Amino acid sequence: MSIEALRARLPDYAHDLGTNLALLVDDPALDPEARWGCFVASACAVGEPQTLRAIDAAATAAGLTAEANRAARKAAAMMAMTNVYFRAVHLMEGAAYQALPCRLRLNRLAHAGARGVTYDLSCVAVSAINGCGACLDSHEADLRGRGVEPTQIQAALRIAAVVSAVARTLAAEAALHPQNLEI
């Protein structure tokens, strides 16, 4: 399924989501690898099958390498774990928990398979979807320290927001109208 086919599956009330999706596919704020990495990572984070398949196919068609695609999926997988942990530690506000080492294996963060900026932008996108302020702050500071502009980080956030909204809308429509599901 293409991005256009994905847009066509959106109900009329979600027209703005489809428009935003189309605009973000060509957004020049990010280079193609970073842009499509954010799309793939966001789709993996949300996990809605139609959205994930369409975005994965579109990313491949747009030239995202298999290695960069795996890196985006790694970002989604690692953030699924770290976002829960660090968000909980942050929300508990207990100094004792913040002082403890997390003791979670994080080797894949260092061996991502994509340029570091691309990987961290994907982590920002997934952390936004998962609502982890601590991870957002950490990755944003790292990106800014490497010269990434706020507009580039904002583009990752916008991709996350739109992919999440598209996926959740399609999931809601599938629950309400299962007879319309694509086989």
UniProtKB/Swiss-Prot annotation:
Keyword Oxidoreductase in annotation: yes
InterPro entries named in the record: AhpD, AhpD-like, AhpD_core, CMD-like
Catalytic activities: N(6)-[(R)-dihydrolipoyl]-L-lysyl-[lipoyl-carrier protein] + a hydroperoxide = N(6)-[(R)-lipoyl]-L-lysyl-[lipoyl-carrier protein] + an alcohol + H2O
Disulphide-bridged cysteine pairs: 132-135
Keyword Transmembrane helix in record: no
Active site annotation, chain numbering: 132 (proton donor), 135 (cysteine sulfenic acid (-soh) intermediate)
Enzyme class: oxidoreductase
EC number: 1.11.1.28
A single GO molecular function term of this UniProt record: alkyl hydroperoxide reductase activity
Keyword set, alphabetical order: Antioxidant, Disulfide bond, Oxidoreductase, Peroxidase, Redox-active center
Primary role: Antioxidant protein with alkyl hydroperoxidase activity. Required for the reduction of the AhpC active site cysteine residues and for the regeneration of the AhpC enzyme activity.
Family: Belongs to the AhpD family.
Name of the molecule in the record: Alkyl hydroperoxide reductase AhpD
